[in-house]
């Protein structure tokens, strides 16, 4: 590490910056503000992002210039004397850095931006070659977006000191590192990136403009360009170029882009169809393939029920210590155990059932507040009432009540009548007699659970 004023001052500044960045790095507005401040000094957003990542890595050396500008930016954004450059740098140092700094921006690009050699498949789908340098510059200038609703995950992180969760890319660091090395070795397969120019984002009302004569495609001003597929490759390539700018022969490596002009909803559907062939996490594909009736129902419950926040999207199983009820894919299976395509003639039928099930689970959660809305993980250890396999039974029971004409207003009292006498504790020998628990006392056999609830009397 370069000595700034003296070693102790250098270490103190580094410690202060690490602390602030660790606490705020998942707050999008904070990152944006830092990037804007750094950009005033000709430092690209991508370079700033790398500095934020590197600051917590003790093996990475950060130059005196970058330390100065990062401290200056933090001082401006956070307005804290902890980051005042004057506390760490001499007047001579600061004047020298400011006057000699040439910046790290190689090329400032923005929309509108035109791609060449573009093949038009339809009015909302085009295909064209793209160089590694173009990918790098688009990413460095924040023109390519990570969209949590159109990617492989809805991974979230809690902001420190709060219960607020924000979406973040779920990056496999090992995969990114492997992609970087393959690219540097010239062995990275020239696979296709999938982008989406999100409908409704352009200020002129038209995100893509195609010229038949020149076979060129222009992405217009203010367009939001989402990366639907290829985010790991994008990060790996940009990381390689940042770390080895001297290998300019790699800049002209050519890849392919399949670009769409879809609404976010349609982009999600496209992603779901594509990944029935190229599978990713089952829960994510299930959530995004909204043309399937069960997915639409679960998504409606997720968006409208009081238990919606406890349905896990970014994973195919739930850890016993997680305060979550069920995964999206398991809820989907529970729906499909009781309902089939034949139950729905129209989209209105699906919506009607989704509303009924939402009201049912709201009423159920109201009856068992601690188990469904409180300390779910703790209650799960003593009771089966919030076990994910029991959702198979609950959906079956809800369908019985729906077919029996039980109104939405009557659901809460009816659930009390039907389930009130059932002892859901794991100590109840009934569960062993029914064959719904294994030798370790864990729930099993969703069909037997469904049978139990289906046989409950509801007309007494």
From Swiss-Prot:
Q: Which Pfam families match?
A: DndB
Encoding gene per record: yopQ
Q: What is this protein called?
A: SPbeta prophage-derived uncharacterized protein YopQ
């Amino acid at each position: 590490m370069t000595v700034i004023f003296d070693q102790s001052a250098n270490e103190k500044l580094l410690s202060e910056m690490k602390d602030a960045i660790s606490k705020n790095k998942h707050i999008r507005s904070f990152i944006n503000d830092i990037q804007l401040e750094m950009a005033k000094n000709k430092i690209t957003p991508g370079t700033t992002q790398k500095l934020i990542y590197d600051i917590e890595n003790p093996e990475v050396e950060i130059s005196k210039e970058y330390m100065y500008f990062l401290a200056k930016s933090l001082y401006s954004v956070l307005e804290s004397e902890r980051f005042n450059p004057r506390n760490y740098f001499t007047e001579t140092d600061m004047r020298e850095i400011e006057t000699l700094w040439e910046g790290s921006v190689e090329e400032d690009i923005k929309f509108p931006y035109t791609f060449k050699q573009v093949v038009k498949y339809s009015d909302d789908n085009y295909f064209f070659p793209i160089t590694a340098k173009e990918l790098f510059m688009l990413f460095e200038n924040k023109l390519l977006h990570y969209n949590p609703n159109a990617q492989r995950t809805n991974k979230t992180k809690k902001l420190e000191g709060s219960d607020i969760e924000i979406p973040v890319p779920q990056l496999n660091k090992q995969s990114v590192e492997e992609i970087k090395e393959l690219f540097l070795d010239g062995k990275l397969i020239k696979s296709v990136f999938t982008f989406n120019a999100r409908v409704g984002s352009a200020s002129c009302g038209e995100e893509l403009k195609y010229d038949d004569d020149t076979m060129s495609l222009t992405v217009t001003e203010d367009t939001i360009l989402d990366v639907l597929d290829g985010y790991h490759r994008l990060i790996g390539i940009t990381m390689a170029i940042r770390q080895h700018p001297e290998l300019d022969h790699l800049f002209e490596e050519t890849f392919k882009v399949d670009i769409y002009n879809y609404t976010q909803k349609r982009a999600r559907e496209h992603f779901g169809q594509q990944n029935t062939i190229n599978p990713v996490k089952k829960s994510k594909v299930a959530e995004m393939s909204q043309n399937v009736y069960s997915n639409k129902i679960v998504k409606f419950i997720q968006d409208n029920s009081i238990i919606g926040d406890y349905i896990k999207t970014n994973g195919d199983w739930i850890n016993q210590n997680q305060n979550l009820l069920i995964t999206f894919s398991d809820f989907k299976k529970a729906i499909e155990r009781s309902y089939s395509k034949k139950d729905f003639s129209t989209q209105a039928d699906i919506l009607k059932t989704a509303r009924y099930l939402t009201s049912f689970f709201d009423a159920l959660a109201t009856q068992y507040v601690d188990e469904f809305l409180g300390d779910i993980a703790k209650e799960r250890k003593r009771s089966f009432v919030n076990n994910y396999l029991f959702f198979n039974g609950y959906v079956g029971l809800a369908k019985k009540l729906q077919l029996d004409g039980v109104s939405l207003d009557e659901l809460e009292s009816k659930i009390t009548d039907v389930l009130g006498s059932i002892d859901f504790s794991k100590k109840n020998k009934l569960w062993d007699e029914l064959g719904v628990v294994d030798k370790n006392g864990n729930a099993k056999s969703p069909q037997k659970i469904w049978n139990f609830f289906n046989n409950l009397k509801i007309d007494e």
